[in-house]
């Protein structure tokens, strides 16, 4: 669950720090209130395309950072596979974009490539907007949800280890 979103130097946003309460969150507002800008920053954080044109002040980089409450999620395997420090309660994801468009991504302060970032964050956030396709229709997401609800993280980690051993044999 997204518990905090920090945005700095993105489009019209100089700095914004939002704390979310537990439960369902809806972002609403009048036309021009900035909903799409916040959604754009969140999309960037989740592995979306970095665009140097979104840099508000070219002397500073864009920083979008989110804190997630991951208690109860089956994510330990991702952290282990990517050699990232694991905290079963909380995870911090950060994306930075320079004025030249160069982008860096981090999970718990460990650098990750954008592909791994996308894979990881699809397990944390599902954005639904008008006319959008739902991630719920993808088999991988359905399996991840079932495994998470069944608390299969240890079984999945053991399977992954056995599979890697078989591939390396």
Regions of interest found by a model, annotated:
Residues 4-166:
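Gly/Lys-enriched N-terminal cap/neck module of very large, oligomeric protein machines
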